[in-house]
Design a protein with these regions (language model features):
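Membrane-interfacial catalytic/cofactor-binding modules of polytopic membrane enzymes
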Residues: 40-45, 49-80, 85, 210-241
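Hydrophobic core segments of alpha-helical transmembrane domains in multi-pass membrane proteins
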Residues: 289-297
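Membrane-interface interhelical loops and short amphipathic "cap" helices
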Residues: 1-10, 34, 60-81, 134-157, ...
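Juxtamembrane interface elements at the cytosolic ends of transmembrane helices
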Residues: 1, 16-32, 93-100, 174-190
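Gly/Pro-rich turn-and-neighbor structural signature
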Residues: 1, 6, 19, 25-58, ...
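Extramembrane terminal tails and long inter-domain/linker segments of multi-pass membrane proteins
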Residues: 141-153, 179-260, 264, 276-283, ...
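Hydrophobic alpha-helical transmembrane segments
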Residues: 80-90, 155-171
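Interfacial and helix-entry/exit segments of alpha-helical transmembrane bundles
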Residues: 29-59, 75-78, 83-92, 96-130, ...
Length: 297
């Protein structure tokens, strides 16, 4: 693609790790102070975070231009984006289905079968796509339907095929559970709040009527649905503000903008420093932007 385009993609690949890392710490922090119950939705949520992190780690590796050149159009890239798309999207969707469908249908899905579905999908998914990292590193190209013998691809592709069947069986059983929960009257009633959730929608009947609340609910606490079931909590972490001084904000300053521009100049200078001109004759020197950016920061 050329030096400029390759450097731009490398820089953007590196920058995307910042908001993604914030999201992951947000999810982990949400669970950190709680008492985790390993029901089926939570298992899929944990699986989602794990698979998404693996996909993120293998993605941020490609901000290194030599690594990106090695993995380009290989099965390593296939493994990376499937960990993000299937591990991130499919596991998240199944988590949401197992969590919210009881509120929609009024029936609880079989918990043991749900955990079995998670086990099949988790094992099948990793058996399918994790070997593709190694296949890509030893040279198997993507978008190629066949290959010659003797490259060392056979065993790992057989493992991936077995994993794909296991993953497919898990998905089919899960979809069967979702569909049958609308029609199978033998399933256990869900009740209002089968998960001990704390938000107001779980104070409604399951399934929810054509309207939500017949009267506007009176909210006296942050977790009103929880307190409706268990009473007010005497010991909790919420503290009243000590005074009404408001939020302290820093004074107006140009230094954040100067720092941002300096960081940009430093990053671009380090990317292009000592690079060779496309003609092969000139070595570019970006010492000045690097020094200027360092001083600005």
């Amino acid at each position: 693609m050329g030096v400029v385009a390759t450097s731009a993609f490398a820089l953007l690949t590196m920058l995307i790790a910042i908001p993604t890392g914030v999201k992951i710490f947000n999810w982990i922090g949400t669970m950190w102070g709680g008492r985790i119950r390993f029901d089926t939705p939570m298992l899929f949520a944990l699986g989602f975070i794990t698979m998404f992190m693996i996909g993120g780690f293998t993605g941020i590796m490609h901000s290194s231009v030599p690594i990106d050149a090695q993995h380009q159009d290989s099965y390593f890239v296939v493994a990376h984006f499937h960990y993000v798309l299937i591990g991130g999207a499919l596991f998240g969707l199944f988590c949401g289905f197992y969590f919210w469908l009881p509120k929609m249908t009024g029936r609880m899905m079989n918990e043991k079968l749900g955990k079995f579905v998670f086990t099949l999908m988790f094992l099948g998914f990793n058996l399918t796509f994790f070997p593709m990292h190694y296949l890509g590193m030893i040279g198997q190209p993507r978008r190629t339907h066949t290959y010659n013998e003797g490259h060392g691809f056979e065993t790992w592709n057989q493992i991936a095929t077995i994993g794909a069947f296991i993953l497919g069986v898990g998905i089919v059983i899960g979809i069967y559970q979702f569909v049958s929960s609308f029609f199978n009257k033998k399933l256990k009633p869900a009740g209002k709040n089968p998960w001990d959730a704390r938000t107001l929608e779980w104070a409604l009947s399951s399934p929810v009527k054509e309207y939500n609340f017949a009267r506007t609910p009176i909210i006296k606490a942050r977790d009103q649905a929880w307190e409706n079931n268990y009473g007010p909590r005497e010991n909790h972490s919420e503290k009243e503000p000590l005074d009404d001084h408001g939020v302290h904000m820093p004074d107006r300053s140009w230094w954040p903008l100067v720092t941002a521009l300096g960081l940009f100049g430093l990053a671009m200078g380090m990317l292009f420093h000592r690079t060779i001109d496309p003609s092969g004759e000139l070595v570019r020197d970006y010492t000045v932007p690097i020094l200027a950016g360092s001083v600005a920061i």
